[in-house]
Amino acid sequence: MNVKPSLDELFERRINFPDFEPQERLARLVGLDEHKDRLSKILGLLVNPYGIQEWAKKYHPDARAAVDTVLRRPPLVVLAGDVGSGKTELAETIGDAVARQEDIDITLYPLSLATRGQGRVGEMTQLVSAAFDYTIEAADKLKNTNGKARGAVLLLIDEADALAQSRENAQMHHEDRAGVNAFIRGIDRIANQKLPAAVLMCTNRLKALDPAVQRRAAEILTFSRPNDEQRHYLLHSKLTGLGLNSTAVEELVRLTGPRDPNSPGFTFSDITQRLIPSIILAAYPYNAVSVHSALQVVNKMTPTPAFIDRQ
């Protein structure tokens, strides 16, 4: 007999917003300002429709039909893109921006990778259903039918393609299909009850997501590797103070881009988690960082291979 997992088993580390730590993490995500702005607005509308209603009263009092169209969008946002593109870090921290923007407290429920299950019959369906049960239970207590929500809940499912593969896939197990159906039902439950909650899905494999899941997305934000301008901003902002001149930074920008037509450039995480620490460690503890040593480091480093998105 299957036992419903506890709240702590499903969500090992719930995060409350606003808070300084996620605010700082969000600020460190340079080069993604457009995605930050877009996602915070979308989630703000989903978890606190009162905000846009007040905006409409002030600026467009006769635009009820247009506003209703915006508010009827399903409470799901998909963040899709290559590995190391910043989508998971953004999903884990954007709640802080939304909480400050809407002036409400928000709790993030990140679905633990350890809860994917061991393949027992009915387990995936049970896990997905339980995740939505806890999300809906918490959001229902925060609902306010007469004004601004008293708070909100964000359910984050990382590596979402593991939960929501296309039911059209001939190799898909019956149990997986049932898990997808449970996910779709969960999205519909939040929408139908008009709860202050939204679901964030992160995936490397957008094409693998079930069409019904994609149709329920209020927005699909795509993430790619940083272009020249983004890499320049990232490298310049992170390396300021190390004595590297503009010519050296430009050379680092070039070397972290595609080195031939068939090769990808560096990801955001390649630069922030591998390259910059390696530049510092190459000099530490007896030497200052030099242009020569920095260029040596980047020349020896290869970017993370591109993820091939297949159905």
From Swiss-Prot:
Changing K87A: Partially inhibits second messenger synthesis by CdnC:Cap7:DNA complex. The keyword Phosphoprotein does not apply. Regulates complex assembly in a CBASS antivirus system. CBASS (cyclic oligonucleotide-based antiphage signaling system) provides immunity against bacteriophage. The CD-NTase protein synthesizes cyclic nucleotides in response to infection; these serve as specific second messenger signals. The signals activate a diverse range of effectors, leading to bacterial cell death and thus abortive phage infection. A type III-C(AAA) CBASS system. Homohexamer. Forms a 1:1:6 CdnC:Cap7:Cap6 complex. In the disassembly complex (PDB:6P8V) Cap6 (this protein) crystallizes as a right-handed spiral; the top 4 subunits bind ATP while the bottom 2 do not. A CdnC monomer lies along the surface of the hexamer at the interface of subunits 5 and 6, with Cap7 (also called HORMA) at its tip, over the central hexamer pore. The N-terminus of Cap7 extends into the pore, contacting 5/6 Cap6 subunits. Belongs to the AAA ATPase family. This is CD-NTase-associated protein 6. It comes from Escherichia coli (strain MS 115-1).
